[in-house]
Amino acid sequence: MTIKVGVLGAKGRVGQAIVEGVNAAEDLELVASIDRGTPLEKLVESGAEVAVDFTQPASVMDNLEFCIAHGIHAVVGTTGFDSERLAKVEGWTQKEDAGNVLIAPNFAISAVLTMVFAAQAAKFFDSAEVVEYHHPNKLDAPSGTAVHTAQGIANARQEAGLDAMPDKTEQSLDGARGADVDGVHVHAVRMQGMVAHEEVIFGTQGQSLTIRQDSYDRSSFTPGVLLGVREIASHPGLTVGLEKYLGL
């Protein structure tokens, strides 16, 4: 059975890769390409069952409210979701005949595994820091992936009953130690030539562990997005993180 898909942000760099992936899949049909100036009603008129959103933080909430209210499932790679926004989306999904929502900080399978592996490793090391690298046109810093990774590390450390990480450093310049995400330092690099990359560095007495993930092309997000499109109907309400669709 073919799943009818609409792509929001279809002319963006990631959106173009998603459109190409949907068109190449025998079990998916692209029925709507939505960009600035295109009314969201096109999703309803085309019979879209799932909408993929790679737009902007400023517009994603309106997009989600529309999709959920019209019973259209939404696979979302747009960033900018804090706890308040997530709570609002979850509330929308609880209404009768609402669409389901998958929000993932990263759809690259390698990035998802990096987050999972980092959380597993966290309890074995005294120190952990996250470094993310992106192209200079990325709008936010640190990335949602880096924040999600740091939160996973912090949660794992808390569950293991670990003390705060050792750090007696006094900053001579503000920001020298990066951002603090629940006690985990996160550093954002913006550099020409980069796409999306992350390093998680762990240290303890006499040893260290580095977990690194690299997305060299935006097509790296396509397999994860298509997995979400295929599976979202069987995951009611709001799901945050692709790892839950992977059984991790």
UniProtKB/Swiss-Prot annotation:
Which EC class heads this enzyme's classification?
Answer: oxidoreductase
Please name the Pfam families in this protein's record. DapB_C, DapB_N
**Which residues are catalytic?**
H134 (proton donor/acceptor), K138 (proton donor)
Q: Which InterPro entries match?
A: DapB_C (IPR022663), DapB_N (IPR000846), DapB_N_CS (IPR022664), DHDPR_bac (IPR023940), NAD(P)-bd_dom_sf (IPR036291)
Sorted UniProt keywords: Amino-acid biosynthesis, Cytoplasm, Diaminopimelate biosynthesis, Lysine biosynthesis, NAD, NADP, Oxidoreductase
Q: Cite the binding residues for (S)-2,3,4,5-tetrahydrodipicolinate.
A: H135, G144, T145
Q: Which domain of life is it from?
A: Bacteria
* Protein name per its UniProtKB record: 4-hydroxy-tetrahydrodipicolinate reductase
* Origin species: Corynebacterium aurimucosum (strain ATCC 700975 / DSM 44827 / CIP 107346 / CN-1)
